[in-house]
Amino acid sequence: MNTQDILQWLQQVQHPAQGDKNLVELGMVHDIDIKDGAICVTLAFPKRPDPLKNYLVGAAQAALYRNAPGGTEVEVKTIVKDPAKPSPKGIQFNLEQLREVSHIVGIASGKGGVGKSTVTVNLAVALARLGYRVGVADADVYGPSIPTMTGTEGVTIEMLGEDENDNLFVPVEKYGVKWLSVGHVSGAGQALIWRGPMASTALKQIILQTAWGPLDFLLIDMPPGTGDIHISLIGDVPMSGAVIVTTPQAVALSDVLRGANMFRNPQVQKPIFGLVENMSWFTPAAHPEEKYYLFGKDGGAQMARNLDIPFLGQIPLVQDIREGADEGTPVALQDRPDGQAFLELASKLAAAV
């Protein structure tokens, strides 16, 4: 629990008379003191009376109790002082920590449930096995799964810096990859109930306030879908381009078009390095020579041709991949055929950027 955590929690409190602006954006957080398992926050109110003062104090206390570890003492004080000048964008970010990153690649999907995070994790491990320096930012703020898939749940994230203005997250290193997830920061199993502006701020912190160091690839596991969070992320992070993950199923393929259009939007204009078809066929462990096309056949390849984007490959639906994700041991670590599929995918991506 640190100052950055508390600032994030206080972003959950909006001033009803100030639209969607929260306490942090309004410059109302005057001081934060953390000592001996207790939190004391001081809010600054203007000289003119604010009829919502008691409400905001109570809402701030509730946000702190809701998010802080059990048993934490919480106190919210107030002072009469004109709040600091509000920032139009809330917490300010810069690109300094990305200066030594060669390629930033967003891993996207038009819808959830297509295995985007599984592909991200195994693609990262495969790139590392090919000798590249790799990092992964899990920006899926609503369902971060990378801590589970990498066996890094419960890891304590270290911080660099003397105060909240220059604190940096230190990513977890495992399997030759640097990992940082919203799930690492928020804690295992903690519900993330954030509105759009708060979600955008959280994922930007994960990407822009992390000491990544020199990297050949930084993969960003983006939230599924296409919306304001995605546009905000793409606008603020200098992505080299994107990879879109789908299944051969018609329902998933219909969402690929929306994802492609998002990156091709005139306000975005990011290259699409290719499309990955996940769950292309099912092969029973006892019958490795058999293929069952449960979701249709070659739909991803056809969609890639229709959109005139590279087709990076097909990943089967097999027990080893699922078990590796559940156990935190990515299948790309192995030289079996399914692991080899991710190595081939990594080689094609490296050639495409």
Where are the language model's segments positioned?
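Walker A/P-loop phosphate-binding motif and the immediately C-terminal alpha-helix
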Residues: 103-142, 275
